[in-house]
Design a protein with these regions (language model features):
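A conserved hydrophobic secondary-structure block that centers on an alpha-helix together
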Residues: 126-127, 201, 211-259
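Glycine-rich, histidine-containing beta strand-loop boundary motifs that form or position
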Residues: 76, 140, 150-153, 161, ...
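Bacterial N-terminal signal peptides that target proteins for export
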Residues: 1-8
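Aromatic- and carboxylate-enriched substrate-binding clefts and catalytic-loop regions
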Residues: 234-510, 545-546
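C-terminal motif of bacterial Sec signal peptides marking the signal peptidase cleavage site
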Residues: 18-20
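A residue-level signal for conserved active-site and pocket-lining positions in enzyme catalytic cores
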Residues: 136, 187, 191, 228, ...
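Catalytic and substrate-binding clefts that recognize carbohydrates or anionic sugar/phosphate headgroups
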Residues: 24-205, 212-213, 218, 225-227, ...
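Catalytic core of carbohydrate-active enzymes
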Residues: 124, 398-410, 417-428, 441-445, ...
């Protein structure tokens, strides 16, 4: 009896110890690198489980092994088969980043799930698990001193942002990279050095994009283009969703609705439009279908745990999915674009690439599916490669498009991505709702994506799901004209959401809003050049004007476009404006102060902002005549930067630009 009591007491102590501690601490190795970057390796780190790094393009240069000299403290542990990394930081630190998420700009107190998912209307997990994964946190402390933390890990993971930053992964032990700088701007630049920056996009992609699920047949596409020009509404791009395909089979064209896609694209080009066409990863499993047959010959498909080909239902029915961990598959996929682009296609839209799979519990393929890999990427299960599936797809697409059109800059838009994927594609924030809530949410969402290294982003203007009201659309297009990526999009079965669909007042608001964007193209293009060279975001939180000012840290309705323009939406309530004489400016003769919809645009004291002449297409873009808006500071001085090149091709890499 005494033995039993002692045993029970011992078990109680053990359970108490497990409850209070819960985690098995592990040792670590710290590598000090240039530029105030430290890399932390847990004792159980297996390089083969994380090589190559999908996030890091340029490995930081080690200086020497040192004791932890960082103001942050990193620790590793194991708990219930999960690998955990925790980062402790000081008081009064505001946290940002974590990629594409719903909620406030400041992420303190939030938990984010990193498992890319098709999240229609952001209904799953309250929008804390969306289409992309960015294992990255930006911290801003007192006096603006800042840090950034990367969990270099693709496996399924959660980020909890409490008194400590906690990364909890279902995969093997992973390394953590910490950046410490004097300002968030310097942290973003260092992130750009590590992950790479965007390539300078074609100028036309900075224009306005009109999309719908779906514009068909081809005569409707032509009519849309004609109406845009007739109504003098600035627009550069018209988009084709899946209904252009033959029975939803990728790289095909419907023989009735789009019998001659080359002629359709030629018509758009003649009227100064570009076209973007959708390509999904799901391939109809059908003998005789050329995409399936050619992939079958090289064993291109993701496999099940039992080594059979995985079949999942998407739009065409039973589909197979390319295994992009194999170099031969990536090359094969890229080669499919040659004939496709030869039909006059200008850009590509990679959708459904989480990958989305219908009629499954989690709307994707099983964790246990197998990726074959090769000498470059190790074979492993889908749990490891799920979050980078879309990233691998868009890299393969981009490479194929470049090979097809070597003299043109590629444009790819993706729904799914991962930290570092900005190198290959722009992104939008997925299937939002036509609601004032989602309009307001679009600002912190786009800002946190921007603060996670993805500068070329924006939501569906007007909202994708549901029906926009005239008032909602007017508010959205008025603000949406200032998103880095400006595209209107709506779902099948919803009302038409073209600028003229809501009556004369909204049509006028839309025209004026887009005229503002197009006159700002010299400034906007310069911001993209800056981002391509430094990693700085195009759309920035207001606190970037003065990171030491605590009162600016929570502002999530107003936002900066670059460093010189502050956008203040009409629905902004008690929005914070930085100190100094920020002046309200007119870009195209509009008077925003008393307007119901147009946001106020304020210029920073000491800034010079260039404008081009009014145009409706970037094909007419010219700097032969420019207008300068000059705002003198208290010292009666001002300065600005203007970058210019041909807007297409790669001559700028050989010095063919003006600065």
């Amino acid at each position: 009896m005494k033995y039993t009591k002692n045993l029970l007491y011992l078990l109680f102590l053990v359970s108490l110890l497990i409850t209070s501690c819960g985690e098995k601490q592990t040792k670590q190795t710290i590598i000090n690198c240039d530029s105030n970057v430290n890399i932390y390796y847990p004792s159980g780190y297996d390089k083969s489980s994380h090589t190559p790094s999908f996030a890091i393009l340029n490995e930081p240069s080690p200086v020497e092994k040192v004791l932890d000299s960082s103001s942050l403290k990193v620790s590793f542990s194991e708990f219930s088969d999960r690998q955990i990394a925790q980062v402790s930081f000081g008081s009064n630190v505001d946290l940002y980043g974590t990629g594409e998420v719903m909620g406030d700009l400041i992420r303190n107190g939030k938990t984010v799930k990193l498992w890319n998912t098709d999240n229609y209307g952001y209904g799953k997990d309250n929008g804390q698990r969306l289409y992309q994964s960015h294992p990255w946190v930006l911290g801003v402390g007192e006096n603006g001193k800042s840090f950034g933390v990367i969990a270099d890990n693709t496996w399924k993971m959660e980020i909890s942002l409490g008194e400590r930053i906690t990364f909890s992964s279902e995969g093997p032990a992973f390394r953590v990279i910490v950046i410490e700088k004097d300002s968030p701007q310097e942290v973003m630049k260092e992130l750009g050095k590590l992950t790479g920056t965007i390539e300078l996009p074609p100028l036309w992609s900075l224009g306005f994009h009109q999309c719908r699920y779906s514009y068909y047949p081809d005569e409707r596409v032509k009519s849309l283009a004609d109406t845009m020009r007739l109504k003098n509404i600035p627009c550069d791009v018209i988009w084709m969703d899946i209904d252009y395909m033959q029975n939803f089979k990728i790289f095909t064209f419907d023989s009735i609705h789009f019998p001659n896609p080359k002629e359709t694209n030629d018509y758009l080009h003649k009227n100064d439009f570009k076209s973007v066409w959708m390509i999904d990863p799901g391939i109809k499993a059908e003998k005789g279908f050329f995409v399936y047959d050619s992939g079958e010959k090289i064993n291109a498909w993701v496999q099940t745990r039992n080594d059979s080909v995985f079949l999942g239902k998407v739009w065409p029915g039973d589909c197979v999915f390319p295994d992009f961990t194999q170099s031969k598959v990536s090359k094969w996929w890229g080669g499919l674009y040659e004939n496709f682009m030869a039909k006059g296609v200008d850009g590509v839209w990679n959708d459904m690439n989480e990958p989305a799979v219908f009629e499954t519990v989690d709307w994707t393929m099983p964790d246990s599916n197998k990726h074959v890999g090769d000498e470059n990427i190790k074979n492993d299960i889908h749990l490891r490669y799920h979050n980078v599936y879309g990233m691998m797809m868009v890299e393969s697409s981009r490479n194929g498009i470049i090979k097809s059109n070597p003299d043109k800059r590629p444009f790819v838009l993706t729904r799914s991505n991962f930290l570092g994927g900005h190198r290959y594609a722009a992104t939008w924030t997925g299937d939002n709702n036509s609601s004032m809530k989602h309009l307001k949410q679009s600002i912190p969402m786009s800002l946190n994506l921007s603060l996670s290294g993805q500068p070329f982003n924006g939501p569906d203007i007007g909202g994708f799901a549901g029906n926009a009201t005239p008032e909602l659309y007017a508010h959205w297009i008025a603000v949406g004209a200032f998103y880095p990526f400006s595209r209107a999009h709506s779902t099948k079965g919803s009302i038409n959401q073209e600028p003229w669909s809501f009556g004369e007042e909204v049509e006028t608001v839309s025209r004026e809003a887009l005229q503002r964007r197009y006159r700002l193209l010299p400034y906007l293009y310069t911001l993209f050049w800056e981002s391509a060279n430094t990693g700085m975001p195009v759309m920035r939180p207001v606190f970037f004007n003065n990171p030491a000012e605590k009162y600016l840290r929570t502002e999530q309705e107003n936002f900066l476009l670059g460093s010189d323009l502050l956008i203040v939406p009409k629905w902004s309530e008690n929005g914070q404006i930085p100190a100094g004489n920020w002046r309200n400016i007119s870009i195209n003769g509009e008077k925003s102060q008393n307007h119901k919809y147009h946001p106020d645009v304020l210029i920073r004291p000491g800034a010079i902002v260039p404008l081009c002449n009014p145009i409706v297409s970037t094909n007419s873009f010219s700097l032969d005549t420019i207008t300068l808006i000059v705002s003198l500071d208290s010292n009666l001085s001002a300065k600005g930067i203007l970058y210019s090149d041909l807007g297409e091709g790669y001559g700028y890499q050989d010095g063919e630009f003006s600065l």
